[in-house]
C-alpha cells in the first residue's frame, strides 16, 4: 500500500515508522505520573522536591538535547541519530525496572530526557521531509492525535500496573524497541526521497515567530502542570492510582480529538483558534478547583483541553 505525500508516495511501513516515533513524544515522565502521589510512601525519606524532580527532569533535559540533536543532524545521518536516541530511551526503561532507590530513579530520568531530546525534533523532521502542503498539515494533525492516543492508552495501563507493583508502569518505556526496528524501513526509504525545492520570499517574521513560541510554551506548560499535579490532587481526594490513571488519560483523550480534524477546526475558528483553546483550558482548570467528585473530574478533563 502506498501513501500519498504531495511529492509522490511512500510505503505504509514507512508511515508506520514515522507514527511510532510520534507516539514516543508522549512517554517521558508518563510512567511515574499515576504513582507520584504514592512515592512518599514507597520512599518515605524522599523530599517533595525529589518526587517532583522525578517527573519533571525528563522534560527539563529534553530541551537542551532537542537543540543539540538539531545541530548534530548537520553532521550525522538523521536515522542513525534517531536509532541512538531510541536505544538510550529503551535502556532507560530497563534501568527503571532495576532501580530500587530514589536517586537511581532520578538518574535514569535524566537518561530518559537525553534519549527523548534526541528523538523529538526528528519525529517532526521526518514528516516535513516526506510530506508537503495539505498532506503535511494532515500528518501533523494525525501525529498529534497519535501522541495523545499513546498517552491515553499508556496512562490507563500504568495506572493499573502501579496497583500491582510500582516497577511495572516503566514497561511502557520499552516501546522504542518497536520504533527501532521500524527505523530501518525509514533508513531504506529516506535514500529515495528527493529533496523539495522551496522558494521563500521575504524575511522571517521574527515577532510572529517569537509570539508563536511563547504561545506554544504557555499551552504546553498549562497542559503539563495538569498531568503532573493531578495525581497529588487525586491523593487528597482519596482516589486510587487506577482512577488517577483513567482521569489523566481522559485529559489526553480530549487533547487527541482535535488532531483528527485539525484542518476543519482551523477553517471554522480561523484566527480565533488560539483564543478558543485558552478559554477551554481556563474553564477546565477553574472547574477542577471546584470539584472533588471522580465522575465530575472525568467530565471536566474531557471538556477542558483543546491543544492545537
Task: Map each language-model feature to its residues.
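Cytoplasmic helix-loop-helix junction between adjacent transmembrane helices
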Residues: 110-146
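Helix-loop-helix hairpin linking two adjacent transmembrane segments in secondary transporters
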Residues: 142-185
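Extracytoplasmic gate region of multi-pass secondary transporters
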Residues: 209-248
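Residue-level detector of conserved catalytic or cofactor/ligand-binding positions
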Residues: 300-308
Amino acid at each position: 500500500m502506498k501513501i500519498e505525500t504531495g511529492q509522490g508516495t511512500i510505503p505504509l511501513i514507512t508511515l508506520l515508522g514515522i507514527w511510532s516515533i510520534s507516539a514516543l513524544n508522549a512517554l517521558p515522565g508518563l510512567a511515574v505520573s499515576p504513582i507520584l502521589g504514592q512515592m512518599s510512601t514507597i520512599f518515605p525519606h524522599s523530599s517533595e522536591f525529589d518526587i517532583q524532580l522525578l517527573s519533571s527532569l525528563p522534560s527539563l533535559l529534553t530541551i537542551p538535547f532537542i537543540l543539540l540533536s538539531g545541530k548534530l543532524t548537520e553532521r550525522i545521518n538523521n536515522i542513525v541519530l534517531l536509532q541512538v536516541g531510541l536505544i538510550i530511551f529503551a535502556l532507560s526503561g530497563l534501568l527503571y525496572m532495576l532501580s530500587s532507590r530514589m536517586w537511581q530513579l532520578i538518574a535514569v530520568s535524566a537518561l530518559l530526557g537525553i534519549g527523548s531530546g534526541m528523538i523529538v525534533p526528528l519525529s517532526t523532521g521526518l514528516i516535513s521531509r516526506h510530506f508537503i502542503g495539505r498532506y503535511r498539515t494532515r500528518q501533523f494533525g494525525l501525529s498529534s492525535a497519535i501522541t495523545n492516543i499513546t498517552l491515553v492508552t499508556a496512562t490507563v495501563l500504568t495506572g493499573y500496573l502501579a496497583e500491582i507493583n510500582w516497577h511495572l508502569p516503566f514497561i511502557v518505556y520499552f516501546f522504542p524497541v518497536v520504533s527501532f526496528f521500524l527505523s530501518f524501513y525509514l533508513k531504506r526509504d529516506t535514500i529515495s526521497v528527493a529533496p523539495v525545492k522551496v522558494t521563500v520570499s521575504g524575511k522571517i517574521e521574527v515577532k510572529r515567530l517569537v509570539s508563536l513560541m511563547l504561545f506554544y510554551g504557555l499551552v504546553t506548560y498549562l497542559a503539563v502542570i495538569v498531568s503532573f499535579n493531578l495525581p497529588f490532587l487525586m491523593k487528597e481526594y482519596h482516589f486510587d492510582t487506577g482512577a488517577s490513571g483513567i482521569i489523566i488519560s481522559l485529559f489526553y483523550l480530549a487533547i487527541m480529538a482535535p488532531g483528527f480534524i485539525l484542518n476543519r477546526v482551523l477553517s471554522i475558528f480561523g484566527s480565533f483558534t488560539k483564543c478558543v483553546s485558552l478559554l477551554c483550558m481556563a474553564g477546565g482548570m477553574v472547574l477542577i478547583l471546584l470539584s472533588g467528585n471522580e465522575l465530575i473530574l472525568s467530565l471536566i478533563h474531557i471538556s477542558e483541553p483543546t491543544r492545537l
